[in-house]
């Protein structure tokens, strides 16, 4: 007589959304890192990362065949050695630097800021749940990559949207566009490079992408 329970739930959500004052927050998303500095954690990270179709864009069967037979049995040891050169006492340098960005952004703006990694922890799902529990319904998602690419911004956007549909369907997502041409970003990078070069004696500066 009065419609299905599912329809009723939809109407309730719409009414709540209209009545709810918009609360804004920022979600910073970076690539990710192994959970620990050991071979098992590195292997798990590589497995998740290289299983992403936006990173390795080949037929799934071939992707997994190469990954399971030729990469995961050998690559974790080499990758672990590379991580050992940069790992800190506080943990992953990527997660630490992302936390630093979060804290500086909070200090400068007073905004509520969550961080997440596209692969491994802290997860996007956890961040979205935290935002939901704290009543933030308008979210500015900032993929921390200046450029646009399938393996960075695109996969991040797809995953955030997928998880938001599952755990936070009422969220309004606003994705910040790639900022590689932003004048302030370019000046900040240039300033950092110049200051570093003044402190260190190098013969050449090489840019690699």
Range-by-range predicted roles:
Residues 1-14:
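Single conserved hydrophobic/aromatic residue that forms the stacking wall/gate
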């Amino acid at each position: 007589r009065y419609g299905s329970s599912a329809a009723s739930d939809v109407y309730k959500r719409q009414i709540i959304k209209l009545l709810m004052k918009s609360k804004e927050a920022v979600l910073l998303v970076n690539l990710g890192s192994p959970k620990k500095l050991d071979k098992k954690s590195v292997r798990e990270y590589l497995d998740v990362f290289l299983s992403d179709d936006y990173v390795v864009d080949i037929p799934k069967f071939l992707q997994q065949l190469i990954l399971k037979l030729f990469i995961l049995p050998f690559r974790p040891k080499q990758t672990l050695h590379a991580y050992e050169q940069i790992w800190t006492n506080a943990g992953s340098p990527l997660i630490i630097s992302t936390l630093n960005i979060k804290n500086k952004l909070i200090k400068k703006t007073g905004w509520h800021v969550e961080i997440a990694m596209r692969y491994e922890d802290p997860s996007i799902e956890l961040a979205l749940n935290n935002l939901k529990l704290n009543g933030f319904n308008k979210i500015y998602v900032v993929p921390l990559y200046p450029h646009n690419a399938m393996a960075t911004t695109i996969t991040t956007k797809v995953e955030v949207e997928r998880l938001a549909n599952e755990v936070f369907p009422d969220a309004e997502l606003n994705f910040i566009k790639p900022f590689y041409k932003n004048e302030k970003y370019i000046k900040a990078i240039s300033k950092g490079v110049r200051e570093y070069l003044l402190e260190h004696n190098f013969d050449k500066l090489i840019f690699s992408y």
